[in-house]
Amino acid sequence: MLNRSVYELAGGERTFKLMVERFYARVAKDPVLRSVYPEEDLSGATERLTLFLIQYWGGPATYSERRGHPRLRLRHQPFAIGHLERDAWLSHMTAAVESLDLAPAVRTALLDYFETASTAMINQPVRS
């Protein structure tokens, strides 16, 4: 068990696909976040995030094979991401993670990562 990746422990590709589908179902209805996603159809964003998370957590490196290095900050720089957007994003991702039947250690690893990563994407000053 100690040698298994979070990808494997979470249930593999199926789990990550489901998590991302649930996340984007919420994003699609969120007026704060829709402006961050320029595509009307979120299927491209869904595929990219799924592939990224699968790779990040120890699954196949399909994301890098197709898109190169993730460069998260650079890829998100064109979009205005402030604390409001970060909080909305994290709320939807937390709900998606918590909707899954995951071991507590896996859930904690995912949520800790999403909190850190989403905070790192903030590129706008605090609004007064």
Label each region the model flagged.
Residues 1-128:
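Core of compact, soluble alpha-helical bundle domains
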